[in-house]
């Protein structure tokens, strides 16, 4: 296969389809989404079987546990994909919405209209759910998309792509609005990220190595995040019961996700009572705690205790490992977070309203939380229906990226024959 020519043809078809999608009406887009959701539920057994083929191959190839976790398509994950599409159906269609209208002294009326970005390239690894989430959001936002999933999920992705095509056809929308790159040749990625004439934005969903490569080589703008180094700070005004629940859930709910806590910060005044109680919870999951000197002094006797190195504060483990640091107060906590955080998601546990509001203002992350687990940093949980990714950049989109993040604004001007003098 001539990869360059193949990807050029994919891009040309996507560009043509994007023009049709930009003018598709809401009813047709919603019909396609509903048909895809119904097909996912109908063919759940087929999807599980395809996923099992991928999982067997992945284990034989020594895929790491965090990636295996992401690759697994459970019954709940299948149901969540369908529910996510139905949530997107229920969301208002942003395309064509005009806002900020105002009259100018010259007599013209100026506003902004929300429009699709055009063609969105999605590059992802062992995440079959991304196939559906991305397709759904791109369809509703009037975009075309080119999906390049990892070879680990090729059978499951192909099964899902078939259902997406079925839904598009049933709604009278162009089949090329959602295209799966059929080859697993990595050269296809290189072509996709260097076709600005056909692709308007790239959204990578994968490990640090993938993102770093794309940052160096892409000629197309990206919506991305590099790391998920998330913090929970337990303030000395925290409710202990809330602190235990949040700090345990943020770490142990799932290890292999970008919104999992990697560093726990504890106020010195509450550390002697809260840390031993937390350690008992972490021991039930064999979590390794890497603490600073003060934390290790409090945690003496914990079975899985190690000294934290300077590198630990800036490490995304994606595993049953947690860095623990004792801080004097919120000033030190905020300083640590803004120094080491990847600007993804950080949370404070406190009953002090003033401190909570200050934490919201001063922590420079895409999602900042009060008395909630970092695991809530997710488009589905935020009511976006699904997310196409999470951005910790500050331009265009920040945080979980839903429908609005896949659109831009153009100026529209209404006149009555005015000319400029």
Curated annotation (Swiss-Prot):
NCBIfam families: PRK00197.1 (NF001221), proA (TIGR00407). Belongs to the gamma-glutamyl phosphate reductase family. It catalyses: L-glutamate 5-semialdehyde + phosphate + NADP(+) = L-glutamyl 5-phosphate + NADPH + H(+). The lineage of its organism: Bacteria, Pseudomonadati, Pseudomonadota, Betaproteobacteria, Burkholderiales. This is Gamma-glutamyl phosphate reductase. Its EC number is 1.2.1.41. One of its GO terms (molecular function) is NADP binding. Pathway: Amino-acid biosynthesis; L-proline biosynthesis; L-glutamate 5-semialdehyde from L-glutamate: step 2/2. It is found in: Cytoplasm. Catalyzes the NADPH-dependent reduction of L-glutamate 5-phosphate into L-glutamate 5-semialdehyde and phosphate. The product spontaneously undergoes cyclization to form 1-pyrroline-5-carboxylate. One of its GO terms (biological process) is L-proline biosynthetic process. Keywords: Amino-acid biosynthesis, Cytoplasm, NADP, Oxidoreductase, Proline biosynthesis. GO terms for cellular component: cytoplasm. It is an enzyme of class 1 (oxidoreductase). It comes from Herminiimonas arsenicoxydans. InterPro entries: Ald_DH/histidinol_DH, Ald_DH_C, Ald_DH_N, Aldehyde_DH_dom, G-glutamylP_reductase_CS, Glu-5-SA_DH, GPR_dom. The keyword Ubl conjugation does not apply.
């Amino acid at each position: 296969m001539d990869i360059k020519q193949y990807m050029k043809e994919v891009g040309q078809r996507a560009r043509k389809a994007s023009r049709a999608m930009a003018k598709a009406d809401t009813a047709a887009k919603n019909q396609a989404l509903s048909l895809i959701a119904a097909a996912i539920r109908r063919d759940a057994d087929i999807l599980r079987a395809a996923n099992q083929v991928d999982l067997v191959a992945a284990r034989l190839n020594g895929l790491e546990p965090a990636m295996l976790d992401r690759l697994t398509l459970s019954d709940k994950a299948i149901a969540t994909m369908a529910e996510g599409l139905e949530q997107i159906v229920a969301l208002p269609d942003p395309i064509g919405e005009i806002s900020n209208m105002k009259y100018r002294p010259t007599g013209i009326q100026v506003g902004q209209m929300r429009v699709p970005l055009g063609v969105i390239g999605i590059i992802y690894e062992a995440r079959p759910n991304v196939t559906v989430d991305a397709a759904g959001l791109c369809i509703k936002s009037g975009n075309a998309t080119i999906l390049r999933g990892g070879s680990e999920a090729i059978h499951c992705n192909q099964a899902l792509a078939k259902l997406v095509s079925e839904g598009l056809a049933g709604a009278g929308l162009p089949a090329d609005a959602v295209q799966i790159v059929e080859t697993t040749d990595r050269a296809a990625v290189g072509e996709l990220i260097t076709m600005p004439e056909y692709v308007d934005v790239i959204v990578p969903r994968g490990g640090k190595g993938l993102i770093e490569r794309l940052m160096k080589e892409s000629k197309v703008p990206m919506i991305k995040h590099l790391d998920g180094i998330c913090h929970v700070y337990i303030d000395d005004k925290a409710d202990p019961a809330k602190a235990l629940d949040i700090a345990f859930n943020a770490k142990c709910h799932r290890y292999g996700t970008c919104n999992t806590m990697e560093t726990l910060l504890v106020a010195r005044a509450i550390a002697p009572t809260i840390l031993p109680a937390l350690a008992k919870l972490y021991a039930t999951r064999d979590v390794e705690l890497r603490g600073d000197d003060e934390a290790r002094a409090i945690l003496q006797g914990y079975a899985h205790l190690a000294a934290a190195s300077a590198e630990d504060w800036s490490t995304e483990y994606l595993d049953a490992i947690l860095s623990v640091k004792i801080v004097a107060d919120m000033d030190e906590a905020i300083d640590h977070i803004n120094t080491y955080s990847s600007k993804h998601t950080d949370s404070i546990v406190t009953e002090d309203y003033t401190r909570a509001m200050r934490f919201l203002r001063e922590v420079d992350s895409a999602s900042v939380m009060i008395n909630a687990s970092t695991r809530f940093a997710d488009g589905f949980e935020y009511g976006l229906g699904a997310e196409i990714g999470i951005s910790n950049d500050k331009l265009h989109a920040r945080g979980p990226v839903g429908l609005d993040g896949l659109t831009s604004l153009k100026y529209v001007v209404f006149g009555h024959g005015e000319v400029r003098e």
